[in-house]
Swiss-Prot record:
EC number annotated for this UniProt entry: 2.1.1.174
Disulfide bonds listed in the record: none
Cellular component terms per the entry's GO annotation: cytoplasm
Transmembrane segments: none
Record's catalysed reaction(s): guanosine(1835) in 23S rRNA + S-adenosyl-L-methionine = N(2)-methylguanosine(1835) in 23S rRNA + S-adenosyl-L-homocysteine + H(+)
Protein name in the entry: Ribosomal RNA large subunit methyltransferase G
Function: Specifically methylates the guanine in position 1835 (m2G1835) of 23S rRNA.
Keyword rRNA processing attached: yes
């Protein structure tokens, strides 16, 4: 794994977060390099107030903090922690960290923008930029060229303003935009829809996974949520919009709940959904975190888990493995981890390695998914 970014006779040492010993993915990509090259070639003669959106692990924030005032906005707890560590590692100047739920800083003079994965999140960020920026503030975005579609550029033109693109470089392309389109009425960040068969109405902020409909895995898992008066503390690990906790709280109203996700928008969506869909006052805590880092051991009776297999733009299985390891530490003796995953992901083998063959059982399966339960 390459950890040294060398450009313009400068060097940064950059790691992903968490910094795993067997990590093979680097902490920046060619898109970061393209943005750095572009801005450096502008030879800006005065310090700028640079707003950086969706900086993966702080490469852009580290680079530009040397000469400019930098604000980094991200929906990712993991990205923010990675940026903090890389800023400290490289003895960089202080960078202001915000979530994408926060307001766009009014003093911004340049916006640099790693495009998010989903168009709902992109649309939200563009509308927030349009509300705040004047037309003379340049917005420069980057992504892999194959991910910048005509529909992507139409979103820029509709919600922000005049848009053009660069030539491709190392399979990446820049998008240049200025905030000059007609101001639109405020767009609600929340998408709402019903799950009739489970008597729920779910609120979804723009960057929540499967925010426009209930994903098939969660729908299957809802049919198999345990109901047991002995469940005192239930953790929803990788909670997303909190749909599993809503069902679990409806079935186990006396339990304490802890909902954990690395997305700030997921955490806020989960909070809204428990408040709206659980009639009794639920004892719940909502935590943006990297898995169960910092949690005490042997505190949970049940952990529900629908693991992601993406970190930023990369496909990886280390998140599921960390979740399973953390769950084993945090579960009480006799506590259970209940996991859903696609059949091809092989979670049964991972769980048996951790919990032992005889302690892992199949709860349910269909043509696409398996639900597994591991007992500590």
């Amino acid at each position: 794994m390459k950890t040294e970014l060398n450009l313009f006779d400068r060097q940064l040492t950059l790691f992903r977060y968490p910094n795993n010993a067997n990590e093979t993915l680097q902490a920046w990509d060619a898109g970061d390099e393209y943005l750095i090259n572009y801005v450096e070639e502008l030879a800006l003669d005065t310090p700028q107030n640079i707003l950086i959106l969706n900086d993966h692990f702080g490469a852009l924030s580290c680079w530009f903090s040397a000469q400019h005032q930098v604000t980094m906005m991200s929906d990712s707890f993991i990205s923010q922690q990675g940026a903090k560590e890389n800023l400290q590692r490289n003895q960089c100047r202080e960078v202001k960290l915000l979530t994408t739920l926060d307001a766009i800083p009014t003093e911004t003079s340049l916006v640099l923008f790693q495009l998010p994965k989903n168009n709902r999140h992109l649309t939200w960020q563009l509308t927030q930029l349009r509300k705040t920026l004047s037309p003379d503030v340049p917005v420069v975005a980057v992504n892999k060229a194959k991910e910048i579609h005509t529909s992507t550029l139409k979103l820029f033109e509709k919600y922000l303003g005049t848009t053009k693109t660069s030539l491709a470089w190392k399979k990446h392309r820049l998008v240049f935009c200025q905030a000059d389109c007609a101001q639109m009425n405020d767009i609600s960040p929340v998408t709402r829809w019903n799950v009739e068969e489970h008597k729920m109405t779910l609120n979804n902020l723009p960057n929540v996974y499967s925010g426009e409909s209930l994903d098939l895995g969660a729908r299957f898992m809802l049919e198999h949520i345990p109901q047991d008066d002995n469940l005192k503390h239930i953790i929803d690990l990788g909670c997303g919009n909190g749909v599993l906790s809503v069902k679990a709280a409806q079935l186990n109203p006396k339990a304490k709940f802890t909902l954990v996700d690395e997305s700030y928008m997921a955490i806020e969506s989960a909070r809204l959904n428990l408040q709206e869909n659980v009639t009794a006052s639920v004892d719940a805590e909502y935590i943006a975190n990297n898995c169960l880092d910092g949690f005490a051991g042997e505190i949970a009776d049940l952990i529900l888990c629908n693991p992601p297999f993406h970190q930023q733009q990369a496909i990886t299985d280390h998140i599921a493995w960390q979740m399973f390891c953390d769950a084993k530490r945090v579960l009480k003796r006799g506590g259970k981890l209940q996991v859903i995953g696609n059949r091809h992901l092989g979670y049964d083998g991972k769980l048996k390695r951790l919990y032992g063959d005889k302690n892992v059982k199949l709860v349910a399966s269909n043509s696409k998914f398996v639900i597994l339960q591991a007992t500590k």
